[in-house]
Amino acid sequence: CRDLQDRLVMIARVSDAGAFVNTNALTLKRSHGDYSVMQLLYDGSEIKAVLDFVNAGEVPIAWELIRSYSYMDCTFNAARLAAYTNEYRRYAEVSMDDLRYMPYLYLGQLLSSTYGYKQYLQTGDEELLAFGRWRTEMCRYLIANAGEVSAELVRLA
């Protein structure tokens, strides 16, 4: 599988470059960590409850921002990510380190996860395979563009 081969090459490349993020420099916030619209229960147009089976914990806010942005937009655009992040910054602090390391953190998290592929092999669900492939495409984009994304986030802050 080309995706698996590419992921192994990307992991080696990132590891050799020492690009994995020191999370001690990042702002931590209490959060669930993987909100999804699939977890929202509605009564008409009003959210009535959030269904979840995982406890909240402290996660890097950079992770929450880039993950939620990428699931919403599906195509990666540094200027739109910066606008999304700047809107959040109107309500809560996001440090320059959070912005600088955001794409590297996301790349490291995505590279270390087989989510989508493993579930596809267990269930045969094509949507899970598509999700795994989408995440690998995101890794390909970030391995080539993380530096530019990082610089754009800091520049537009």
Feature-to-residue mapping (PLM):
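ATP/Mg2+ or Mg2+-diphosphate-binding catalytic cores
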Residues: 113-157
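Hydrophobic packing residues in well-ordered alpha-helices of helical domains and bundles
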Residues: 1-7, 81, 132-135
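Active-site catalytic-loop/activation-segment of kinase and kinase-like phosphoryl-transfer enzymes
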Residues: 1-19
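Active-site activation/catalytic loop segments of kinase-like enzymes and analogous catalytic loops
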Residues: 62-93, 107-126
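Active-site acidic catalytic loop and adjacent metal/ATP-binding pocket
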Residues: 15-63
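Helix N-cap / loop-to-helix initiation motif
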Residues: 94-98
